[in-house]
């Protein structure tokens, strides 16, 4: 084979020409027509072909937590290139881009202010397209992802995910829900209080929604090709009852917040978007100790498994039915109303159940296991018809270890207050003009 410049330039391509391409380390043939088949139409919509997507597959009742990832694996890096840490103001506008290698600095190398209540430390995620499918013949769950507008795919709107657990702070006579470093997170509040405090910060803010968390969790699955977050970030082995009933000995911490291992921002010393620290030691008020490993993924600290539950907005369960908010940013109601839409029935049994509706990778309606606990985990009730249940995510120190992965719980009612329940801040991206869930046609 001669040098590239030794060959004359082709003219008037007809589509039946053959090219040599490098695929999985081997040189193979491809036609111009095949490459053109992946091109968008005149409306900018791409066809659903392997070149335009990365696909994650998992079999129902699969014992392993690992997944099969196929098609264009280079799409994973393209999707993750859309995400970055930043500081946003009270209008949810980016005021500083943080250094992805070292978030204590801006991209310009200047010191970053991560503890100012007027600027929230967030990770911008979303901005891609995805599609869920189920193959009944092979009993396989399939999720497809693309940075392109692929026909039949739904748009995942850009949004800001918290870098840190939620902190309630009073400023100007109003409580605000913050995502700041070097502060104690706030537990022992109800979801209405958290959401109100988020809205006090600005119209685009909200207490983190289940939909926000699901996107974050799916990105972990896609990046790690595995569903068991505790395989990478172990926070098991806590005495949950003791932890919940023992006040934090630090005088700066609220004594009602019994589930804090450290102030936010401890993982800022981890370079890059993910990793965990060496074992740290926590000392209880009675002198007892526990060790743990602070971690972060996608620049967000402690959102895959942790010592306390995080209350979420965006979904409700009542009378054995699940509902989701039609618009997670504008919905402020915590009761079933016109702002919610029905998605599926919940089982009418009493106890815990795993693997539920389509928004997860393990919908029980399609035959998923009710015992493996590979994903969602919530309380079902046999007779209740009036109470409203809300989702909680991440997992308590004992619950998370029982489940073995990031998880979803549901709580009894919207107004309870527990020392092992916190929340976190999320925000819409007002610069994104495409509605969430838009289907490419």
Summary of predicted features, one role per range:
Residues 16-23, 300-302:
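Short hydrophobic/aromatic-rich beta-strand motifs
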Residues 21-38:
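Short, surface-exposed terminal/edge motifs of secreted or surface/virion proteins that either
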Residues 23-26, 128-130, 166-168, 212, ...:
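Acidic glycine-/aspartate-rich tracts in secreted/extracellular proteins
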Residues 42-129, 133-182, 272-275, 297-298, ...:
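Short acidic-hydrophobic catalytic motif
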Residues 214, 236-267, 308-317, 330, ...:
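C-terminal, surface-exposed recognition/capping segments
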């Amino acid at each position: 084979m001669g040098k590239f410049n030794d060959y004359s330039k082709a003219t008037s391509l007809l589509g039946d020409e053959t090219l040599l391409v490098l695929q999985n380390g081997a040189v193979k043939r491809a036609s111009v027509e095949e490459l053109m088949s992946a091109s968008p139409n005149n409306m900018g919509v791409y066809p659903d072909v392997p070149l335009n997507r990365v696909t994650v597959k998992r079999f129902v009742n699969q014992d392993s937590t690992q997944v099969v990832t196929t098609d264009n694996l280079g799409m994973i890096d393209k999707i993750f290139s859309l995400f970055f840490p930043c500081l946003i103001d009270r209008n949810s506008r980016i005021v500083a881009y943080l250094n992805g290698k070292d978030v204590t600095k801006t991209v310009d190398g200047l010191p970053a202010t991560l503890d100012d209540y007027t600027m929230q430390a967030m990770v911008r995620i979303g901005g891609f397209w995805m599609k869920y499918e189920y193959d009944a013949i092979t009993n396989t769950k399939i999720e497809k992802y693309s940075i392109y507008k692929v026909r039949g795919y739904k748009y995942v709107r850009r949004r800001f995910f918290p870098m840190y657990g939620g902190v309630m702070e009073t400023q100007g006579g109003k409580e605000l829900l913050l995502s700041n470093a070097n502060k104690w997170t706030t537990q022992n509040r109800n979801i209405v209080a958290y959401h109100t405090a988020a809205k006090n910060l600005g119209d685009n803010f909200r207490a983190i929604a289940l939909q926000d968390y699901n996107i974050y969790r799916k990105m972990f699955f896609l990046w790690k090709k595995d569903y068991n977050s505790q395989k990478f970030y172990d926070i098991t082995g806590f005495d949950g009852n003791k932890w919940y009933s023992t006040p934090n000995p630090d005088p700066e911490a609220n004594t009602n917040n019994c589930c804090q291992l450290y102030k936010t921002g401890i993982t800022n010393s981890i370079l890059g978007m993910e990793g965990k620290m060496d074992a740290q030691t926590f000392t209880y008020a009675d002198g007892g100790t526990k060790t743990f490993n602070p971690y972060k993924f996608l620049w967000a600290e402690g959102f895959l498994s942790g010592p306390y539950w995080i209350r979420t907005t965006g979904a409700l369960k009542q009378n054995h039915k699940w509902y989701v908010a039609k618009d997670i940013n504008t919905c402020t109601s915590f009761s079933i109303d016109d702002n919610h839409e029905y998605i599926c029935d919940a089982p009418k049994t009493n106890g815990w159940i795993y693997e539920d509706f389509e928004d997860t990778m393990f919908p029980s309606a399609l035959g998923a296991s009710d015992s493996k606990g590979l994903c969602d985990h919530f309380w079902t009730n046999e007779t209740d018809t009036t109470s409203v249940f809300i989702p909680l995510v991440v997992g308590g120190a004992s619950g998370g270890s029982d489940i073995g992965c990031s998880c979803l719980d549901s709580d009894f009612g919207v107004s309870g207050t527990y020392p092992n329940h916190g929340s976190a801040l999320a925000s819409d991206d007002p610069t994104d003009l495409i509605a969430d869930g838009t289907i490419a046609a």
